[in-house]
Amino acid sequence: MSITSQKKKSLISTYAIKEDDTGSSFVQCAILTERISNLTEHFKAHKHDHNSKRGLLILIGRRRKHLNYIKRKFGNEAYQELIEKLGIRK
């Protein structure tokens, strides 16, 4: 369910604005998206795991807040580009 450090490093290098940029909203959205997709796969086998379902909803809300910040701060073009790169809908 968690992300390996190698996967996290590859996400950081892909979405970072500057070198060693781990805190930008772009990177955080990418990491949250990976965690959400891992949890979604987990629920295919464990349908009644309600505690993890709550954690998933919290992660989705956190990603939504980061995406709203990106849209407000960097504009609609950066927002749309990030959504396409991540492969999420909105």
Curated annotation (Swiss-Prot):
Family to which this protein belongs = Belongs to the universal ribosomal protein uS15 family.
The annotated subunit structure for this chain is: Part of the 30S ribosomal subunit. Forms a bridge to the 50S subunit in the 70S ribosome, contacting the 23S rRNA.
PANTHER family given in the database record: RIBOSOMAL PROTEIN S15, BACTERIAL AND ORGANELLAR (PTHR23321), SMALL RIBOSOMAL SUBUNIT PROTEIN US15M (PTHR23321:SF26)
Kindly give the HAMAP family that the UniProt entry links to this protein: Ribosomal_uS15_B
Function field: One of the primary rRNA binding proteins, it binds directly to 16S rRNA where it helps nucleate assembly of the platform of the 30S subunit by binding and bridging several RNA helices of the 16S rRNA.
Query: Coiled coil located at which positions?
Result: none
List cellular component terms (GO): cytosolic small ribosomal subunit
Which organism's genome codes for this protein?
Wolbachia pipientis subsp. Culex pipiens (strain wPip)
Protein name per its UniProtKB record: Small ribosomal subunit protein uS15
Output the Gene Ontology terms for molecular function: rRNA binding; structural constituent of ribosome
- By its UniProt entry, which NCBIfam families does this protein fall under? S15_bact (TIGR00952)
Q: Which GO terms describe its biological process?
A: translation
Instruction: Give the matching Pfam families.
Output: Ribosomal_S15
Q: Which UniProt keywords apply?
A: Ribonucleoprotein, Ribosomal protein, RNA-binding, rRNA-binding
